[in-house]
Amino acid sequence: MIENPSPSAANLPEHPSTDASHPRNIRSFVRRTGRTTVGQAKAFADVGPRFLLAYKAEPLDFAAAFGRVAPTILEIGFGMGEATAHIAALSPDKNFLCCEVHTPGVGALLKRIQEQTLGNIRILQHDAVEVIDNMLPAGSLDGVHIFFPDPWHKKKHNKRRLIQAPLIAKLAARLKPGGYLHCATDWQPYAEQILEVLSAEALLKNTADASGGGYAPKPDYRPLTKFENRGIKLGHGVWDVVFTRV
């Protein structure tokens, strides 16, 4: 299941509509440009063969991929991998399956893995929705992290947002009973949509009480990234939404 793809995003598909009325067209990303650094390219060569998994339209063998059986957390869109590496270091007893299509971000996380000697992360450089559909069996996950997905601020672009009912239904089905789904955003209108969508999913239950408006306190495991700290200093809010599988 392991490959070392070339650190190039040239062949990534464009972002189609993610309108909830067309669930087959949901994608977890939009195309972005960016260059890998020398250090990131070196990490691809040095540790990519071990930590990058090949996408295949068949159920993933978690034990083979990670070399052990352990609770598995899916992360969708890890950016430059800062929070991912922090959480993985705090939880060596858990496996982290991380999806990101943007090559500089993948290279950055590989570099962190190498520098911090993290053995519990595996990366799929592929659209997360196809990974969920074709590689993750029902009841296979212990948790899901979706931190700061693109908010698509303009109303006409809201339909492109990742967190919509079709995707949440897929994720809920793949969580084990008692597993959790944790979303975080710094855009209040998106936070409201996330809360509404997750609340409407029958297989999920909110962990927060009404006193917080349905939003959860920031879990200790999620670090404040440089980006988030910058936003807080500018007076921006951050909303965490944490639901569990019933």
From Swiss-Prot:
Q: Which GO terms describe its molecular function?
A: tRNA (guanine(46)-N7)-methyltransferase activity
Please list where the region (Interaction with RNA) is annotated. 156-161
The chemistry this enzyme catalyses reads: guanosine(46) in tRNA + S-adenosyl-L-methionine = N(7)-methylguanosine(46) in tRNA + S-adenosyl-L-homocysteine
Upper classification of the source organism reads: Bacteria, Pseudomonadati, Pseudomonadota, Betaproteobacteria, Burkholderiales
* Species this chain originates from: Polaromonas sp. (strain JS666 / ATCC BAA-500)
Q: In which pathway does it act?
A: tRNA modification; N(7)-methylguanine-tRNA biosynthesis
For the ligand (S-adenosyl-L-methionine), the binding residues are: 75, 100, 127, 150
What name goes with this protein? tRNA (guanine-N(7)-)-methyltransferase
The encoding gene: trmB
Q: Give the function comment from the record.
A: Catalyzes the formation of N(7)-methylguanine at position 46 (m7G46) in tRNA.
